[in-house]
């Protein structure tokens, strides 16, 4: 027996799709174009290349440990929340909420993170911290530090936030980091599990119509001189799965020469 599916699964004629495409093109070309383009990250050169974070896109941010991918992702999240007033959900599988808050506050206040962790603050640092706290107080940033969280659990938490009629829906999701996620089911191997996770992250991005920034580790192969003489990462260096670049709409690599100096 063949049952009729949801409207979203029906075949769409090209004529209808062209009308929608032309309508969207008029929007992004008109005087209110900024409302219809991707969400600005606050980093001008990056926004020029990406035209912002596209709704429904899965963006992979990859680097070796210690390269600064968490700090960079938190910087984007903070700018999106504060400058664009777009609610951001941060799922940290590596750090606690307290550690995330420390990083966000120290970055916004311009205080050295080491001094922040040890409490070795100067008198003026407390003033900067007070100003940063005031600026961040109403920033729509939501954090979750559940270890081994699944995509199903993430969606449930996002929908719970979105049910509140007094505030706008979550508009950006940041996940730190991909290799610490689980499917909640038994998998034959880790490569298959990561493949399932990235595929379902892309589906979640489309379902919720939000960009997802998922941080990813790189394999140790990038450290080997024979891989490429400058240690600059490439797609083949993504750890645990070849499907990451297939499911992602964009892959960003962080690299600093000084890291290898």
What residue ranges belong to the model's regions?
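Phosphate-binding/switch region of NTP-binding enzymes
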Residues: 47, 193-261
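Core recognition of P-loop NTPase motor domains used across DNA-transaction enzymes
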Residues: 1-55, 111, 125-127, 131-140, ...
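Structured core elements
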Residues: 38, 45, 58-62, 72, ...
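Cytosolic-facing regulatory segments adjacent to core modules
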Residues: 48, 82-169, 183
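Flexible beta-alpha connector loops of hexameric P-loop NTPases
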Residues: 35, 113-123, 142-148, 182-195, ...
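P-loop NTPase nucleotide-binding module
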Residues: 52-95, 152-164, 171-174, 185, ...
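Conserved nucleotide-binding/hydrolysis micro-motifs of P-loop NTPases
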Residues: 66, 95-98, 106-107, 147-150, ...
